[in-house]
């Protein structure tokens, strides 16, 4: 259900409404961070910088880049999160960040880094065969320009870099919360914490993905 809402918001709203809602969510995330009166350190400073950077990118997303690129960046982070969580629960044995995020395992970490690239490139290949359902789903993803400009190897590498940025964003948020001795940044989303808890893995991934695409 949440995925459908995101699709409707990203692709079926006008630029003004899209910009207002996106900026409002980011500003509320900024409020969630600042209201905790967190001392500015490396981790909170990085979060602050990337929240502000994402706010600054709202106009380029609507006027220069495309909603498809924005959605693709979101998808990279989501696939990274889901694959890391599921593979970590199923096969995870070795804890790699005990003082930052004690539930993060090496197996989940590796899955979160590589699975988004494998998933997106696999379905970009399948989409060539005019399979109706795949084509309908894949119309929201913009990866062909990267494949044409960079080739498969560099595109795969670029997607892996974006996945790493997603994981780093999540780890930075986890470290910030541990320093503050809190579980979540907020409680505006029942069962999910605050907006910042949902956005942490996207904050670095989105700018990096857009920067990579600016070279096309």
Report each predicted region and the residues it spans.
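Membrane-embedded alpha-helical bundles of polytopic integral membrane proteins
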Residues: 1-164
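Juxtamembrane boundary at the C-terminal end of a transmembrane helix
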Residues: 126, 210-216
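Hydrophobic transmembrane alpha-helices of multi-pass small-molecule transporters
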Residues: 3, 116-117, 198, 205, ...
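C-terminal transmembrane helix pair
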Residues: 177, 202-208
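Juxtamembrane helix-boundary/capping and inter-helix hinge elements in multi-pass membrane proteins
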Residues: 92-97, 178-187
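Divalent-cation-assisted or electrostatically stabilized phosphate/pyrophosphate-binding catalytic cores
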Residues: 110, 187-203
């Amino acid at each position: 259900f949440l995925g459908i809402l995101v699709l409707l918001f990203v692709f079926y709203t006008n630029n003004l409404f899209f910009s207002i809602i996106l900026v409002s969510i980011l500003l509320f995330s900024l409020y969630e961070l600042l209201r905790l009166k967190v001392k500015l350190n490396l981790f909170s400073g990085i979060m602050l910088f990337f929240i502000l950077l994402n706010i600054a990118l709202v106009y380029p997303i609507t006027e220069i880049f495309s909603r498809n690129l924005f959605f693709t960046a979101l998808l990279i982070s989501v696939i990274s999160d889901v694959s890391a969580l599921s593979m970590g629960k199923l096969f995870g044995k070795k804890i790699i960040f005990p003082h930052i995020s004690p539930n993060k395992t090496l197996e989940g970490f590796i899955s979160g880094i590589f699975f988004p690239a494998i998933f997106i490139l696999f379905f970009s290949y399948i989409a060539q065969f005019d399979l109706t359902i795949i084509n309908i789903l894949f119309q929201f993803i913009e990866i062909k320009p990267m494949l044409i400009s960079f080739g498969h190897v560099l595109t795969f590498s670029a997607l892996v870099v974006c996945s790493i940025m997603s994981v780093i964003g999540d780890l930075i948020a986890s470290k910030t919360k541990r320093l503050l001795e809190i579980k979540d940044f907020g409680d505006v989303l029942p069962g999910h914490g605050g907006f910042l808890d949902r956005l942490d893995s996207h904050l670095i991934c989105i700018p990096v993905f857009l920067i990579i695409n600016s070279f096309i």
